[in-house]
Curated annotation (Swiss-Prot):
<dbReference type="Pfam" id="PF13853">
    <property type="entry name" value="7tm_4"/>
</dbReference>
<feature type="topological domain" description="Extracellular">
    <location>
        <begin position="80"/>
        <end position="100"/>
    </location>
</feature>
<dbReference type="InterPro" id="IPR000276">
    <property type="entry name" value="GPCR_Rhodpsn"/>
</dbReference>
<feature type="topological domain" description="Cytoplasmic">
    <location>
        <begin position="50"/>
        <end position="57"/>
    </location>
</feature>
<feature type="transmembrane region" description="Helical; Name=2">
    <location>
        <begin position="58"/>
        <end position="79"/>
    </location>
</feature>
<feature type="topological domain" description="Cytoplasmic">
    <location>
        <begin position="219"/>
        <end position="235"/>
    </location>
</feature>
<feature type="transmembrane region" description="Helical; Name=1">
    <location>
        <begin position="26"/>
        <end position="49"/>
    </location>
</feature>
<dbReference type="GO" id="GO:0005886">
    <property type="term" value="C:plasma membrane"/>
</dbReference>
<keyword id="KW-1015">Disulfide bond</keyword>
<keyword id="KW-0675">Receptor</keyword>
<keyword id="KW-0812">Transmembrane</keyword>
<keyword id="KW-1003">Cell membrane</keyword>
<dbReference type="GO" id="GO:0004930">
    <property type="term" value="F:G protein-coupled receptor activity"/>
</dbReference>
<comment type="function">
    <text>Odorant receptor.</text>
</comment>
<keyword id="KW-0807">Transducer</keyword>
<dbReference type="GO" id="GO:0050911">
    <property type="term" value="P:detection of chemical stimulus involved in sensory perception of smell"/>
</dbReference>
<feature type="glycosylation site" description="N-linked (GlcNAc...) asparagine">
    <location>
        <position position="5"/>
    </location>
</feature>
Amino acid sequence: MWQKNQTSLADFILEGLFDDSLTHLFLFSLTMVVFLIAVSGNTLTILLICIDPQLHTPMYFLLSQLSLMDLMHVSTIILKMATNYLSGKKSISFVGCATQHFLYLCLGGAECFLLAVMSYDRYVAICHPLRYAVLMNKKVGLMMAVMSWLGASVNSLIHMAILMHFPFCGPRKVYHFYCEFPAVVKLVCGDITVYETTVYISSILLLLPIFLISTSYVFILQSVIQMRSSGSKRNAFATCGSHLTVVSLWFGACIFSYMRPRSQCTLLQNKVGSVFYSIITPTLNSLIYTLRNKDVAKALRRVLRRDVITQCIQRLQLWLPRV
């Protein structure tokens, strides 16, 4: 029994995304540049929303949560991949694999729920503008964000506990650059019916955000069609444009990665899909909201025109208890 437990806690081997050739050295450098852009963009978005009082609204609070999720998502995957590449090692501990598995599932699920909440925010803003302060105030926004985090955490904790409880056999080589569940589950020795059932249930639950987003935009489209002013229509499309773009990128990448027939899946396609939604999408999200959103762009210009350090100190003093 002791030997079995020791074996189950042995390290996993990650195949990685790169090898030691010059071409892959260039690709690694490119990936790190994209990673730095993602970290910088999402961090900037979070700081702007915290610093600028005009962005202290439920809509931008939810946007800050999206940026935080993207920042954590890309860091969870890329930092370990970069460490292994630079050190020449390919191993990841059992606890490290379980942690990475939990975090990427949690952050992915939370982002799905949060995008649905953000679509509801757009629906209230366009279809019920006079009741927006009641239906979508700061307390409601905070509660929805907490529920997104909590629901995704419980779901991913169940997944992680079930998957990592199984015995693993063979060389324990994960044919991926991080501990994604389709790659890890292939190493399991034994019946995985319980885990497959859990995956099916979670998939059905994660279809709920898609339904809520679609329903919200059906009502939004109806309201926009009934608008007589072309200016109002442009404002409505501007309000929804960034969110729709992010939704399309995120769910499109997820569908490509997880909802294709197994007969059509290859290791290369799986890696490409994972790179897109775990690296490219978090990078594009911050750029989309920064470049397309006029309020965020104006906040950036305001911050650049004043002493940022002074503003940060003033904000910090407001939070610190008075002595």
